A protein has these predicted regions:
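Carbohydrate-active enzymes and regulators
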Residues: 196-200, 345
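Alpha-helical tetratricopeptide repeat
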Residues: 1-115
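Juxtamembrane/interface motifs at transmembrane-helix termini
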Residues: 75, 108, 186-187, 366-367
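Long, positively charged leader/targeting segments at protein N-termini
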Residues: 87, 116-172, 176-181, 208-564
């Protein structure tokens, strides 16, 4: 399976390639010429050559009309800043394809972004004025508005190494301690209630100030999203259906149930809380979970919402550092490198699987090497043996499932996964009562072959649960013109989310296929064909060197090959 994670196009070379094809015009029919113009249009789009891309797409469409091209044209006009033309094309597509739910969200997003863009900018200016009055520092940054749900902080000037990117006064930070001073917070303390989440404290501040026109937090609350359409707990059914089979789907449903349980608990136990609706509570909790910082103030660990700082988007290598300056009583973000003017500035939300980014924050990373999937051990599989003797092992629910990423992400975690699989497929009664550590290393060639078959079967069973094939997902995300591939859209995020999981299952199918060959072929054949050497230098080299070579060397064949 080709991974778009590994796809690095040289778009300039591809434009030249398709230009040569078009110019030679080797008696191609209209369908082929349409395809050539379409392909060149895609590469020009990726290069930011939107006018050239538009010209090529028009030629392609004239030769072979296609309704989906209307959305592709809309993408181009959106990039060109022609909102009117963009909406005209999207509405035309919607009229011809009313069943396509996603198109309504595209239209609403563009309409709302246009309507509220100026208003939002004024609100941010008001917030900035308040922060500066309270001794915050924001001279080095400005806000770039991408969509309703996506804004980013960019540099307003050149920023030097170890220079302050921004500083936010403690007076402007919503902290856990302030939450305990709210009316709701005081009642919680008086009644000695145990809250479901520490995030509740700051949620209480938001709720009590939500409708107060004279609140000191007014300018901050005014810029907070009124809706979180990009966060999966608010998704409509059509998006949830796209996530069928995904690990994150159960997390989304669990999150919704958890918030409802929290609300019911607070409503039933606190008089000061009864005035707030479930919708208001979920809004406040979502604000907190999508923006919270864990900070140390005067030596005390606490949590806080920090205006402006909470708009930095995530990057695994942000080249910034944040901390609370106890001397000056400000939250600081400083540079770990020099930044030129007009470049994005990032924070890190930590290394997480896309399912956590998606459920908690409403975004996914195209290139996320921290992705994991859940393996549910299929106890009915033909490879599994002797379950009636393994009841003690089965009594621990954690032994029936395993969260796993690629091998190099966490080698020890992979070895534990293998040990569970080895025990399940083990048919040697003498080993049933052995300690778990026995299975951290291979026990026999036949057992390991059965383990690999078992892993392959589990992967295939998981892949069958998804609502689309991996190839279909890949075709979408590799095509910048595909109607489901609009930047920052929910539909695209769903596709990236599910493809990332399928990629890991496919990763282990390939591992199992290759390693079964290594364990079943003659040793001389492995050497002559370079299968073993290739495996030792490939992406599964840790497993091959740790386990496969250990098994192949039981009679000293590898030692003999290496040292004679």
């Amino acid at each position: 399976m080709l991974s778009f994670l590994e796809s690095d196009y040289n778009d300039i070379e591809w434009v030249e390639y398709y230009t040569n094809k078009i110019d030679t015009n080797e008696c191609y029919d209209s369908g082929k010429m349409s395809e050539l113009y379409y392909e060149r249009a895609k590469h020009n789009y990726r290069l930011g050559e939107y006018l050239k891309s538009n010209t090529d797409l028009e030629k392609s469409h004239q030769l072979l009309p296609n309704d989906d091209n209307l959305v592709s044209f809309a993408f181009i006009y959106e990039k060109l800043g022609n909102t009117k033309k963009c909406l005209e094309l999207l509405n035309k597509y919607k009229k011809a394809n009313p069943e396509e739910e996603f198109i309504k969200d595209y239209i609403n997003d563009i309409v709302n972004f246009g309507c509220y863009d100026d208003i939002s900018k004024k609100k941010f200016e008001a917030l900035k004025d308040w922060l500066i009055i309270e001794n915050s520092f924001l001279d080095n940054i400005k806000i770039k508005f991408n969509t309703n749900d996506n804004r980013e902080i960019i540099s307003q000037k050149d920023i030097g190494l170890n220079e302050s990117i921004l500083e936010i006064s403690l007076k402007c930070m919503m902290t856990t301690e302030l939450g305990k001073e709210t009316e709701i917070g005081k009642e919680v303390i008086d009644k000695n209630l145990s809250l479901y989440s520490k995030h509740n404290w700051i949620s209480f501040i938001l709720l009590e100030n939500l409708h107060k026109s004279d609140s000191i937090w007014r300018t901050y609350i005014d810029i907070l999203p009124k809706k979180f359409d990009n966060v999966p707990i608010f998704f409509k059914k059509n998006y949830l259906n796209m996530l069928k089979g995904c690990t994150c789907l159960s997390k989304i449903l669990s999150k919704i149930a958890s918030l409802q349980t929290e609300y019911k608990f607070l409503f039933n136990n606190l008089e000061t809380f009864k005035k707030y609706s479930l919708a208001e509570y979920i809004w406040a909790r979502t604000v907190v979970i999508t923006r919270i910082y864990g900070v140390v103030i005067d030596g005390i660990k606490t949590q806080a919402l920090v205006p402006f700082a909470d708009m930095l988007n995530h990057n695994n290598n942000p080249e910034t550092q944040w901390f609370f300056d106890d001397i000056n009583k400000v939250f600081k973000i400083v540079s770990k490198k020099k930044f030129n003017v007009n470049v994005p500035i990032y924070d890190s939300y930590g290394k997480k699987c896309n399912s956590r980014f998606f459920v908690n924050y409403g975004f996914v990373l195209d290139r996320n090497m921290e992705n994991t999937v859940r393996f549910n051990f299929d106890l009915k599989s033909t490879e599994v043996s002797g379950l009636k003797y393994k009841k003690t092992f089965l009594s621990n629910s954690s032994n029936k499932t395993h969260i796993l990423g690629e091998i190099e992400q966490n080698r020890n975690n992979f070895n534990i996964f293998l040990a569970k699989a080895r025990y399940y497929v083990c048919n040697d009664e003498d080993l049933f009562d052995e300690s778990f550590s026995t299975f951290l290393v291979p026990i026999s060639i036949q057992n390991e072959i059965n383990v690999l078959k078992y892993i392959m079967r589990m992967c295939i069973n998981h892949i069958r649960k998804y609502s689309s094939s991996a190839k279909n997902d890949l075709d979408i995300v590799l095509n910048p013109f595909h109607k489901y591939n609009r930047e920052y859209s929910n539909v695209r995020n769903c596709i990236i989310m599910r493809y990332g999981e399928k990629f890991i299952y496919d990763y282990y199918i390939k591992m199992a296929t290759m390693c079964i060959k290594l364990l079943t072929r003659d040793f001389e054949d492995l050497i002559e064909t370079n299968l073993l050497l290739d495996a030792l230098s490939g992406k599964y080299h840790l497993y091959v060197s740790d386990s496969i070579c250990d098994l192949l060397n039981t009679d000293g064949k590898i030692d003999k090959y290496l040292f004679e």
